Amino acid sequence: MNKDNILHTDTNIKITLFSEVSIGISANSALFFSHLFMLFEKNRSKPIDLYIAFLSLTQLMLLITIGLIAADMFMSRGRWDSTTCQSLIYLHRLLRGFTLCATCLLNVLWTITLSPRSSCLTTFKHKSPHHISGAFLFFCVLYISFGSHLFLSTIATPNLTSDNFMYVTQSCSFLPMSYSRTSMFSTPMAIREALLIGLIGLSSGYMVAFLWRHKNQARHLHSTSLSSKVSPEQRATRTIMILMSFFVVLYILENVVFYSRMTFKDGSMFYCVQIIVSHSYATISPFVFICTEKRIIKLWGSMSSRIVSI
């Protein structure tokens, strides 16, 4: 894949990518400020608000970063130097790792919070925020340290076209690395992502079992008219399942597109599709949070009424 092929990528792909980034930035901004306001209001705030606010902030920064990278991919106006390339590529990789880590730990915290009193997870309910904060800091340090090789492998794109370089944008490229060096950096990253995806799978499986058991108990304890009402626990559980199912599907699809890109010599189209797929969760997940969280709707309603009264 060379830089000329990226410039001449189909216009519909470009429009889709920039639309996704714009919508995602707006949605994550709304979600972040909503939870930020709720954190300052003691009667509305919950411990999980801080983690959702951090996830939305991370996704917001991720989409801004990929927006800058995409602009350099399709609009060859000016050229970045090596320092700018290294900083943006490293920041993007770091924010992607933070997003995966925050999604996993938020899912685990949600699972512990919604678990019934008879569950073995009850003992972690009061300790979980502190433990999860510590785990998050641990994974952040890992991502910061293991991503430092990007400063060595990222350079400003040379003027001469070469098949040895892997073009990222019009200004930035990856230096070719040996198989042993590639394995040395990719193996820890694969293990780390497998661990986080495994935690997401386990906690999601637990929530499926909880939802199924809760539904069966409702059939025995209530009449049909009463059991049709959805409890807050069921609503929250379904929100988790929608988000995590969507996350896992996109993660698998992203890897399929990535290997397809590696298979074909001219993978400019696959490269753009991979970017769109890999950032779809950051764009769509805020809408799921906003639509299923009644507190946000009430907050916006109260703020609108205050503005109208003024």
Swiss-Prot record:
Side of membrane Cytoplasmic, spans: 41-49, 115-131, 212-238, 291-310
Domain of life: Eukaryota
GO biological process: response to pheromone; sensory perception of chemical stimulus
GO cellular component: plasma membrane
InterPro entries in UniProt: GPCR_Rhodpsn_7TM, Vmron_rcpt_1
Covalent S-S links between cysteines: C85-C172
Subcellular location, record wording: Cell membrane
Glycosylation sites: N159
Side of membrane Extracellular, spans: 1-19, 71-93, 153-190, 260-269
Pfam families tied to this protein: V1R
Presence of keyword Disulfide bond: yes
Residues that span the membrane, as ranges: 20-40, 50-70, 94-114, 132-152, 191-211, 239-259, 270-290
Annotated Gene3D superfamilies: Rhodopsin 7-helix transmembrane proteins
SUPFAM superfamilies linked to this entry: Family A G protein-coupled receptor-like (SSF81321)
Main function: Putative pheromone receptor implicated in the regulation of social as well as reproductive behavior.
Similarity comment: Belongs to the G-protein coupled receptor 1 family.
Name of this chain's protein: Vomeronasal type-1 receptor 97
Organism of provenance: Rattus norvegicus (Rat)
